[in-house]
């Protein structure tokens, strides 16, 4: 399995050489200082690009990251229609490394930076990001619900609890466990 440094060097060298890629970010568990690192953590990478079209014409360019043994392109699936303007590649390589690579247009940068605070800027070719970004997992802390949220949760539980008995009485096990 390649090391973290090898993966970062590979990603950053590729991005640095490609003029369409303006910003590279790392998200997720690898940015979280509050959890122990391990070799099984994915590399959640985002490329902010000025032209997504060229990337989407062919997947051949992805081979620079290694020998892909399995890939999923969620935005290209009928099962999960796209929710945003980006495109992602979930890639598993023959050495066990997993890279979740997302392409986003540069125009989405501001919105992106407000969505999740577990972000590290790896490359900013144009100095578009003016403030220091410090990854934090504070959005994931468990917070006490308001009285209203607690009441709503209890109401939902009791409302759908009847589905279990209905499903079991009808012999519809999947309905009962959903």
Model-derived features: where do they sit?
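Short aromatic-enriched loop/helix-cap "lid" or pocket-rim segments at secondary-structure transitions
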Residues: 36-39, 113-115
């Amino acid at each position: 399995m390649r090391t973290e440094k090898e993966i970062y060097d590979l990603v950053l060298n590729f991005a640095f050489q490609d003029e369409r890629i303006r910003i590279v970010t790392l998200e997720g568990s690898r940015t979280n200082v509050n959890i122990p690192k391990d070799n099984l953590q994915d590399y959640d990478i985002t490329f902010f690009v000025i032209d997504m079209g060229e990337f989407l014409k062919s997947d051949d360019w992805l081979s620079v990251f290694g020998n892909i043994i399995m890939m999923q392109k969620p935005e290209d699936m009928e099962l999960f229609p796209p929710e945003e303007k980006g495109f992602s590649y979930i890639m598993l390589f023959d050495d066990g490394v997993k890279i979740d690579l997302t392409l986003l247009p540069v125009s989405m940068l501001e919105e992106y930076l407000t969505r999740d605070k577990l972000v590290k800027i790896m490359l900013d070719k144009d100095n578009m990001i003016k403030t220091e970004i410090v990854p934090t997992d504070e959005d994931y802390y468990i917070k006490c619900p308001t009285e209203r949220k607690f009441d709503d949760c209890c109401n939902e539980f009791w409302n759908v609890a009847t589905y279990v008995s209905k499903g079991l009485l009808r012999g519809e096990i999947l309905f009962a466990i959903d």
